[in-house]
Amino acid sequence: MKHLLSTENLSLFDAVRVLDTAEEMSAVGEREVKKLPALRGRTVVNLFFEDSTRTRISFEAAAKRLSADVINFAAKGSSVSKGESLKDTAQTLAAMGADAVVIRHWASGAPHRLAATDWIDAAVINAGDGTHEHPTQALLDAFTMRRHWSQVNGTESTGADLKGMRVAIAGDVLHSRVARSNVWLLKTLGAEVTLVAPPTLLPIGVEHWPCKVSYNLDETLEAGIDAMMMLRVQGERMNASFFPSTREYSRRWGFDDARLRMLDDLGMKDTIIMHPGPMNRGLEISSAAADSPRSTVLAQVRNGVSVRMAALYLLLSGDSREAAPNVSQSSKETN
């Protein structure tokens, strides 16, 4: 892998490779000194044209745990706000010696454009482009699911896929780059995916995606699921009314207290509840569901650092087929 731009074209080998490397990286977070020397002397630039808290901080933590130098670039207050183009910004970063660029952009396809040009000779990681994709979010979601699925089945997670796992993704699919990346990646890993949303919040052409589509959340739950992922209603991307009211939306497509009890009533004791964040509590998910023992919300945040460490390591350390660095040995080098 030279870049990480999309999950649609990510092979099963590469997907499992990232997840397995993330397993190695997660051990770093359990140590007293949470650092490896793997990317010492490398420079990672977080190039964010959209506001972000979780993703930017997660990438920064990941890069620093690998001993890379990190430059955080926000469009607000920069030359971009004065009209500087993506090309000029990229060439400026190239002149500064950037080895990797983590880019979030409001325009779908911007990371692909950056990777396809000669503006900068650096690894490009898509941290979210418009409503298109968010590959590292999908990878950390898959990492979280794989750990849970392996625990349920009593198997090792390393080297495993998600064959047979039933995943429902509900909410604002139309504006969700997370949904798109998850559908492609989960299909590659062998999971069965069902999208649940009102017709107004489903994109044109969704019938051609490798998943099922439902308009009824209760029917989807009754059919049986192993993971329930709720998506945030992205009001900032809406310029029209996509549903009658927030109350009606919550009643029909939100994961409320009643649906939380339904999992128990249906005997689905191992079903987990996921959310990529940030959450609209009381709209797409109730506080009881978000804070329940079934919730993996905080685990997803924690796993995100490990997955992003893996992505940076595989892109910048040379041969992506090499094994992850020996954590115990590297511990001695950094102490």
From Swiss-Prot:
Keyword terms, alphabetized: Pyrimidine biosynthesis, Transferase
Reactions accelerated catalytically: carbamoyl phosphate + L-aspartate = N-carbamoyl-L-aspartate + phosphate + H(+)
Annotated GO biological process: 'de novo' pyrimidine nucleobase biosynthetic process; 'de novo' UMP biosynthetic process; amino acid metabolic process
GO molecular function: amino acid binding; aspartate carbamoyltransferase activity
UniProt key word Amino-acid biosynthesis: no
Class of this enzyme: transferase
Sequence positions that bind L-aspartate: K82, R177, R232
Binding annotation for carbamoyl phosphate: R54, T55, R104, H134, Q137, G277, P278
Any Pfam family hit: OTCace_N
Keyword Transcription assigned: no
Annotated PROSITE patterns: CARBAMOYLTRANSFERASE
Pathway linked to the protein: Pyrimidine metabolism; UMP biosynthesis via de novo pathway; (S)-dihydroorotate from bicarbonate: step 2/3
GO cellular component, one term: cytosol
EC number(s) from the headed UniProt entry: 2.1.3.2
Family statement drawn from the similarity comment of this UniProt entry: Belongs to the aspartate/ornithine carbamoyltransferase superfamily. ATCase family.
Oligomer status and interactors: Heterododecamer (2C3:3R2) of six catalytic PyrB chains organized as two trimers (C3), and six regulatory PyrI chains organized as three dimers (R2).
Function: Catalyzes the condensation of carbamoyl phosphate and aspartate to form carbamoyl aspartate and inorganic phosphate, the committed step in the de novo pyrimidine nucleotide biosynthesis pathway.
Name of the protein: Aspartate carbamoyltransferase catalytic subunit
